[in-house]
Amino acid sequence: MRALLCAGVLLASSVFAATPEFAAVTPGHSISLAQDSGAHDGFRTEWWYATGWLDTPDKQPLGFQITFFRSATGHDPADPSAFAPSQLIIAHAALSDPALGHLAHDQRIARQGFGLAYAKPDNTDVKLDAWKIVRAADGHYEVTVDADGFSLHLALTPTQAPLLQGERGYSRKGPRPEQASYYYSEPHLRVTGTVVRPAAAGGRSKDGTVVTGAAWLDHEWSSTLLDANALGWDWLGANLTDGSALMAFRIRGRDGRAMWAHAALRNRAGEVTTFGRDQVDFTPVRTWRSPRTNTPYPVSMTVKTGALTWRLDPLMDDQELDSRQSTGAVYWEGAVRVSRDGADVGRAYLELTGYADALRIGRD
């Protein structure tokens, strides 16, 4: 879902090309790893999105989010100017630390080139200045982010096979078949590394904290925007304690109703159950109002997937992210606990967009 946050930047950059043409997302395409873990420059937008819960020696959990975006501008390749970018690289990083009480986050944006910013094909290798995510030959990821006020140096190691979303990786995002992406997830990544936490008084703490934990990585690429009547979306990626993995999302229309919805639940035996738009429901339980933007977010929700109901409660309420300096959106994105029938069953990340403002995603 997240690459659509790049739409505002992409549309603004379209001055470099009057009629850009991008590769189409079509059903029946076979995702091949590790080759498809790399960049797909022919498509309009792409992103690598890692989220997770971290355990610390003081038993105070943290949440983290790291995202790298690639956005094609449609720049005419016949223009020899090195300063007219064909690709933009954008990065977000955030740390949810209850001791701080609000989200610590940072963002970067740069044109691809000069070895300072790139997204390479064939294998995950994305860099923006000193921020990077690299997939090693054994499939694990090395992530380095030295941000304003905090840092994340993490290794993410697969413990399960990738989960192809939708129809073998072809993931519908709206009523028209071209409103789709190629999309796979890697749930239950084992996390090791160090985190420098933000200091409560500002700046950052001096010493790194050794952490372990579990993460979820999404990789998605597309050339189409959401339907023009879309207001925003709600997305969930959950690592469940029994080894299962749950992904669910809904696209909200301007009338408040779900325009599209989908969910996939893979059990610990590897069997996948999918749920269509009429089987998925997000229902607010409690809202929190941002003191900065006055936006009410449904930070506690129930999510129904068929006959199953999941309760989501945040690690902390204030996980609002302001990305107006890069992708142009303000939204809520944070660590949540997952329960069923009052029992703790997992850890997840929840993304809530279009509550501060309707997404200005343009028209196809």
Question: What is each model feature region?
Answer:
Residues A18-D364:
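Structured soluble/peripheral alpha/beta segments that form catalytic or ligand/cofactor-binding pockets
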